[in-house]
Amino acid sequence: MAIKIYKPTTNGRRHMTSSDFAEITKTKPEKTLLESQSHTAGRNSYGRITVRHRGGGHKQKYRIIDFKRNKDNVKAVVNAIEYDPNRTANIALLHYTDGIKAYILAPKGLKVGDIVESGDSVDIKPGNALALKNIPTGTSIHNIELKPGKGGQLVRSAGASAQVLGFDGNYTLVRLQSGEVRKILSSCRATIGVVGNEQHSLIQLGKAGRKRWLGKRPQSRGSVMNPNDHPHGGGEGKAPVGRPQPMTPWGKKARGIKTRDVKKASEKLIIRHRKGSK
């Protein structure tokens, strides 16, 4: 992937960048692997806003991704690399030798015509999936399961990867992208390689309209609201917060408060917390 830079013909184009989509080999998705999805604009079943700053955006079809990778010892050929509007990573269309088609996350370096497979004794190469207990120390992995058979939940965004550090009984030590070192059951599966489209984080939207295409609405600062809308609101002119520290819209402290329950059951599986966390 390379970053496409636009000439500053307008103010909106001045700082705009995008992907050149050089890796994409097919523009129309596989119809049998599509599902329709409705947008709720951040509202729940009562019609009340539960997530702010959402709404609008382009319609999208959901691509059914195989996160489980449990089709063992059946080889598949990479038929195409496609764009997926629902995630930052690209996806690969697989054609299995038994006629089944499936989408997977496209790892870095995967090309059309490559062979991938799943199982306990498959080769250690990008796109292959196997249990953590069979992956050598130091290998980069993604799409990691937290519960055997549930499907990959960790390390799925563009350019992300984790690393196998070692083994401890029934667990495998994995260092995640955040720097957190965590124990994961060795029977859980992961896919070899780094998630592709690694330069996605360098893309600059350049204008507000592209943000709206993604279904994201404008966000107002609390200090410009009325006092009945936000703890920072009210006052004459540019008034200070007026509190010992910044607050959330719901009156809770916004900084320095732990966002994870220290009594959570999985806390004992975390060997070292992520960077910046105590």
Swiss-Prot record:
GO cellular component: large ribosomal subunit
GO BP annotation list: cytoplasmic translation
HAMAP family: Ribosomal_uL2_B
Subunit structure and binding partners: Part of the 50S ribosomal subunit. Forms a bridge to the 30S subunit in the 70S ribosome.
Compositionally biased spans, kind Basic and acidic residues: 258-270
UniProt xrefs under SMART domains: Ribosomal_L2, Ribosomal_L2_C
Signal peptide per UniProt: none
Keyword line: Ribonucleoprotein, Ribosomal protein, RNA-binding, rRNA-binding
Source species: Lactobacillus acidophilus (strain ATCC 700396 / NCK56 / N2 / NCFM)
InterPro entries linked to this entry: NA-bd_OB-fold (IPR012340), Rib_uL2_dom2 (IPR014722), Ribosomal_uL2 (IPR002171), Ribosomal_uL2_bac/org-type (IPR005880), Ribosomal_uL2_C (IPR022669), Ribosomal_uL2_CS (IPR022671), Ribosomal_uL2_dom3 (IPR014726), Ribosomal_uL2_RNA-bd_dom (IPR022666)
Region (Disordered): 210-278
Physiological role: One of the primary rRNA binding proteins. Required for association of the 30S and 50S subunits to form the 70S ribosome, for tRNA binding and peptide bond formation. It has been suggested to have peptidyltransferase activity; this is somewhat controversial. Makes several contacts with the 16S rRNA in the 70S ribosome.
Protein name: Large ribosomal subunit protein uL2
Keyword RNA-binding assigned: yes
Gene from which this protein is expressed: rplB
Family recorded in the similarity comment: Belongs to the universal ribosomal protein uL2 family.
Presence of the UniProt keyword Ribonucleoprotein in the record: yes
Compositionally biased residues, Basic residues: 210-219
GO molecular function, one term: structural constituent of ribosome
